[in-house]
């Protein structure tokens, strides 16, 4: 499938005889400037620039609008940016494709009324039920000025970044391996939601498929041997918390390591496919099974996934090694092959949390952390247990983010930028030094056999730096539909005297992140307790950076209302028509607008 692209539509006054001719160069300069800005700053999740194409002609009326639409229809255009320095003919030139996300940039100048066209065409968009984002600079520019002001660039880039996410979602699959884990509602795969709001196909694969591929050798054997050698050299075994009388033997543990490495290759191949499976031929006992003898061609295709999940508990983990290693490595920005794009893979098959992780990945290019939103620690409770109060970003209390070790190793917080600051990097900027640091900050503890009878290994680390982070969650509410929750904040580092005591009170073999949301003093962000109390599920996705404003824009494109956030009103950017649903209470207006327009693909 061709990559989704952004189409730029240069709109012009259609009057020949001097008017149109005088505007051609300026109009195309706007289009070229927008293309350059976007392609230098917005990237697909594979790290390549988000491709922009420009209409083969300027658009002065319906005939040229149709010519542009015909061209875009061959290019997998997921979003359009219409640009103009002048008055043009609103509904005659607008983008009428109901499946594209739309924005219009009207040049703020005095020679020609770009603002008047912008207002006119946005009125047409609102009347036709085709919401569009408005882009208009705060300061007047001279007509000869082809630069893009900072405020305009910010809106163009946010629109493009979020439109790229919409385009990358459409036409892909969610592959849920297994079913609902332990009654967790997010594990229930609502195919209508995935299809209508995201354009994603829901796929189901029984966990027995993993067993089949292990037993029949349906994986790349050369990669397996290389991966196992790398794991033995780079993934040290952590402490075993199990009583000695029930601990697995060294021989059992060795078999578990072999199994979880195979399982990692297999889950990846189920989702993405692997051409090498075409050449994997059954040998020995494997050849006695019915099935292909010249390679595993169906399995090589994969399932066109953009994300997946693994049920694990309980039917699998009661007798097989758990999925912690697999989940952690797929979600991380590297493996035995070096740096790689993280493959979003949800613990306990919680697809809604997987989707939340994926949205964070698509707008940042970085790994996302999967965790239980486990415990709220107030300063008073910390003092009672530890004899001292937390300080710094944790002074008002914090939330313990922890889950059996499916967390991306990027969350160790040991990667550094050029200035020495701790970061989670875009995967394509991860260095060998970063990989080495993340591996050294992590060990792999044998699973708690009381909970995971089949064994397995959990990544074990603590987030070692204060970093800006955003916690994200999509929930589905009966009678309402999907809603998005956002909490910007910081990871916290605690003195060992506090960290050790608090960490030992839960499962100390799991990775720990202490998270302090940024408080506003009102609503769900009145205090840390209120953030925890209003969170809509047991899981959260945590992404690097304060990306709430991007997520709010993206949610409006998908028609998903935002139920909770701590982003300033002045940073909220939604389609222009949202203001028709109210300007005083933006949260309520968002609900009304999303309800009025409905799912993007319904």
Would you name each region that the model predicts?
Residues 1-602:
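An N-terminal assembly and electron-transfer interface module characteristic of large anaerobic redox
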């Amino acid at each position: 499938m061709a990559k989704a692209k952004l189409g730029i539509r240069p709109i012009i006054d259609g009057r020949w005889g001097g008017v149109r001719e005088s505007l051609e160069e300026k109009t195309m300069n706007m289009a070229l400037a927008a293309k350059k800005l976007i392609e230098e700053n917005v990237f697909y999740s594979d790290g390549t620039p988000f491709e922009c194409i420009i209409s083969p002609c300027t658009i002065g009326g319906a005939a040229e609008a149709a010519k542009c639409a015909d061209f875009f229809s061959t290019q997998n255009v997921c979003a359009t940016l219409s640009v103009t320095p002048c008055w043009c003919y609103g509904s005659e030139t607008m983008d009428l494709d109901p499946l594209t996300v739309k924005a219009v940039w009207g040049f703020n100048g005095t020679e020609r009324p770009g603002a008047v066209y912008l207002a006119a065409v946005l009125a047409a968009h609102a009347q036709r039920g085709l919401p569009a984002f408005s882009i208009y600079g705060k300061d007047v520019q001279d007509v000869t000025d082809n630069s893009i002001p900072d405020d305009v660039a910010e809106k163009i880039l946010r629109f493009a970044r979020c439109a790229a996410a919409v385009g990358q979602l459409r036409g892909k699959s969610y592959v849920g391996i297994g079913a609902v884990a332990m009654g967790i509602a997010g594990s229930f795969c609502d195919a209508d939601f995935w299809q209508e709001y995201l354009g994603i196909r829901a796929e189901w694969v029984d966990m027995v498929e993993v067993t089949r591929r292990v037993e029949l050798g349906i994986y790349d054997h050369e990669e397996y041997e290389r991966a196992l050698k790398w794991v033995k050299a780079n993934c040290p075994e952590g402490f075993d918390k199990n009583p000695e009388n029930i601990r697995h033997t060294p021989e059992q543990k060795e078999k578990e390591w072999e199994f979880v490495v195979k399982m990692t290759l297999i889950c990846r191949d189920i989702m993405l496919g692997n051409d090498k499976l075409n050449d994997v031929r059954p040998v020995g006992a494997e050849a006695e099974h019915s099935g292909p003898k010249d390679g595993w061609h169906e399995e090589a295709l994969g399932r066109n996934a953009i994300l997946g999940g693994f049920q694990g508990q309980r039917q699998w983990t009661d007798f097989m090694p758990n999925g912690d290693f697999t989940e952690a490595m797929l979600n991380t920005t590297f493996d035995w092959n070096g740096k790689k794009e993280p493959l979003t893979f949800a613990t306990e098959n919680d697809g809604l949390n997987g989707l939340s992780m994926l949205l964070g990945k698509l707008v940042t290019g970085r790994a996302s952390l999967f965790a239980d939103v486990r415990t709220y620690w107030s300063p008073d409770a910390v003092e009672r247990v530890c004899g001292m109060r937390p300080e710094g970003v944790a002074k008002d209390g914090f939330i313990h983010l922890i889950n059996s070790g499916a967390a991306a190793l990027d969350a160790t917080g040991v990667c550094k930028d050029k200035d020495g600051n701790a970061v989670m990097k875009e995967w394509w900027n991860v260095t060998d030094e970063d990989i080495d640091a993340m591996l050294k900050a992590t060990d792999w503890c044998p699973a708690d056999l009381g909970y995971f009878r089949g064994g397995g290994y959990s990544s074990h680390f603590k987030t070692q730096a204060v970093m800006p982070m955003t916690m994200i969650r999509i929930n589905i509410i009966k009678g309402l539909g999907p809603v998005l929750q956002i909490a910007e904040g910081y990871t916290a580092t605690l003195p060992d005297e506090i960290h050790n005591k608090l960490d030992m009170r839960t499962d100390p073999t799991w990775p720990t992140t202490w998270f302090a949301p940024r408080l506003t003093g009102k609503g769900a962000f009145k205090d840390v307790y209120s953030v925890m109390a209003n969170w809509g599920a047991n899981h959260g996705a945590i992404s690097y950076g304060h990306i709430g404003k991007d997520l709010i824009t993206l949610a409006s494109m998908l028609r998903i209302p935002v139920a909770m956030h701590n982003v300033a009103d002045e940073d909220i950017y939604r389609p222009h028509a949202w203001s028709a649903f109210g300007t005083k209470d933006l949260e309520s207006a968002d609900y009304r607008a999303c309800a009025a327009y409905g799912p993007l693909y319904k």
